[in-house]
């Protein structure tokens, strides 16, 4: 009787619990099998590694073997960004599992287990199960973690780009130096550093000029509008007032010229001006011409005086005047 009661009171797990336990037991074996199959297809040579650019193909290969996708759309974007950072990076299986856990936010085994479970359990049971709650919490974290991861990956990508640009410039510099002089130059390294610093300075100058242009044309529209208004006003004043100002100046000049001419004419026509004030003519100011003038003037005046005295004497003798 006691045995029957104990048997009747034994715990009997439900079907869903048995399914979950079965999934737990076969999860690691199944995920390993899927990864080995995908790895054997995409591995490079016999060294047992793949390139980072092969990760999306590995995930796609495993997705075809599962009832649902292994990753979400946001996971795919993060993986793509990480792959583009260094597509030729070599990865072993352990490194792949670490990268997958970092990028997706869950381990590879758990992701495979969740993808396999989605075809067996109903949505209600799946939502109430352990994996469903884990998937929901993982989805909640996906809204925060990928954004931070993307920022970190972008910063790392920019650093690698800067390093690549630096190495490319260094290579081009040494290549040009080798073409100029095949012999080894001791100060080549210093010359490259100086040229690189000059290039950085030029880039900074260009950035400053761009910022100035943005300040002039984009970031201070009020100042720009005010400056344009002042320039337009100056242009209108120049086109409208300048011709009138020139006409007024021309009229004033003509007025002063005519007034001066009239005054000069009046002063020259007056008769009450004494003779000693009048200005001598040009031939009177010449010494030679002035002497000739006075010579002939004296001779003429002497002849006139002598002739007049003879006429007076004859007149007196005729009329008996003594």
UniProtKB/Swiss-Prot annotation:
Membrane topology: Single-pass membrane protein
GO CC field: cytoplasm; nuclear membrane; spindle pole body
Keywords from the named record: Coiled coil, Cytoplasm, Cytoskeleton, Membrane, Nucleus, Transmembrane, Transmembrane helix
Coiled coil: 147-217
Family the UniProt entry places it in: Belongs to the MPS2 family.
Function in brief: Component of the spindle pole body (SPB) required for insertion of the nascent SPB into the nuclear envelope and for the proper execution of spindle pole body (SPB) duplication.
Name of the protein in question: Monopolar spindle protein 2
């Amino acid at each position: 009787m006691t045995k029957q009661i104990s048997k009747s009171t034994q715990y009997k797990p439900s079907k869903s619990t048995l399914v979950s336990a079965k999934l737990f037991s076969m999860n690691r074996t199944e995920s390993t099998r899927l990864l080995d199959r995908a790895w054997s297809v995409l591995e490079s040579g016999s060294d047992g590694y793949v390139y980072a650019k092969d990760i999306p193909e590995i995930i796609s290969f495993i997705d075809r073997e599962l009832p649902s996708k292994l990753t979400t759309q946001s996971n795919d974007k993060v993986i793509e960004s990480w792959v583009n950072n260094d597509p030729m990076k070599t990865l072993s299986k352990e490194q792949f599992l670490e990268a997958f856990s970092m990028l997706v936010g869950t381990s590879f085994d758990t992701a495979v287990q969740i993808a396999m479970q989605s075809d067996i359990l109903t949505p209600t049971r799946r939502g109430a199960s352990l994996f469903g709650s884990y998937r929901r919490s993982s989805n909640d974290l996906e809204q925060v973690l990928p954004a931070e991861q993307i920022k970190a990956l972008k910063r790392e990508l920019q650093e690698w780009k800067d390093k690549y640009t630096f190495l490319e410039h260094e290579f081009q510099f040494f290549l040009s130096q080798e073409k100029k002089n095949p012999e080894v130059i001791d100060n080549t390294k210093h010359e490259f550093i100086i040229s690189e610093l000059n290039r950085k300075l030029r880039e900074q100058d260009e950035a400053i000029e761009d910022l100035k242009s943005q300040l002039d044309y984009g970031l201070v529209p009020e100042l720009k509008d005010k400056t344009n208004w002042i320039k337009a006003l100056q242009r209108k004043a120049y086109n409208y007032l300048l011709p009138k100002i020139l006409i007024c100046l021309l009229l004033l000049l003509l007025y002063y010229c005519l007034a001066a001419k009239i005054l000069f004419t009046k002063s020259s026509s007056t008769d009450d001006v004494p003779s000693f004030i009048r200005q001598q003519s040009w031939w009177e100011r010449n010494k030679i011409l002035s002497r000739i003038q006075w010579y002939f003037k004296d001779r003429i005046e002497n002849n006139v005086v002598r002739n007049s005295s003879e006429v007076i004497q004859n007149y007196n003798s005729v009329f008996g005047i003594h």
